[in-house]
Amino acid sequence: MPGERPTDATVIPSAKRERKAITLDLKLEVLRRFEAGEKLSQIAKALDLAISTVATIRDSKEKIKASSQIATPLRASRLTRHRSAVMESMEQLLSLWLEDQSQPNATLSAAIVQEKAEFDDLQREHGEGSQTERFHASQGWLVRFKECHCLPHFKMNSAAPSNKDMYTEMLKSIIEEGEYTPQVSLT
């Protein structure tokens, strides 16, 4: 048939480019170069970005500059999908809280961070439109949050820290109730 490809021809599938997260720092560099008067194609070539990407960064200049005022590190990559204002606010507050908790040798349990991430009070603050959004601070969310906000240095225990303490307290109560002496309880 005239419209079909020959069967002996090898078909090379087009390679889909991997999505590249652009850091806020790089976006600010693009904007700085625009303000200095560089052309769009020159910026794209110098920073190894697509021209359409550089144009999109130029068009969303106000949003990028507003994001740079927030306390997240400049090397943090911006999320590529749209997040609600309540979710962004919660993640910013949680990031600040984690930075405050950054004492040497301090480990946080994942359960504490996930509990802190619940944003019911923020939803009430933002009104009824945000009440419909559901959020569960899952383990996967926590991993992505740490990666997005450049927080890999925080050590988080996934196990509850109370198991060891609970066993110690139970043992003490058994010893006291049975009126055992320390020598008898160790044998």
Swiss-Prot record:
The main location is nucleus
Query: Domain HTH psq-type: where?
Result: 13-64
Question: Please, which domain of life does this record's source organism belong to?
Answer: Eukaryota
GO CC annotation, single: nucleus
> Where in the cell does this protein reside?
Nucleus
Gene Ontology molecular-function annotations = DNA binding
Which UniProt keyword terms apply here? DNA-binding, Nucleus
Ranges where the HTH CENPB-type domain occurs: 78-155
Q: Which Gene3D superfamilies match?
A: Homeodomain-like, Winged helix-like DNA-binding domain superfamily/Winged helix DNA-binding domain
Task: Quote the InterPro entries the UniProt record gives.
Answer: Homeodomain-like_sf, HTH_CenpB_DNA-bd_dom, HTH_Psq, WH-like_DNA-bd_sf
DNA-binding region(s): which residue ranges? Answer: 40-60, 111-148
* Pfam families with a match to the protein in the record: CENP-B_N (PF04218), HTH_Tnp_Tc5 (PF03221)
The gene coding this protein: CENPBD1P
- The molecule here is called Putative CENPB DNA-binding domain-containing protein 1
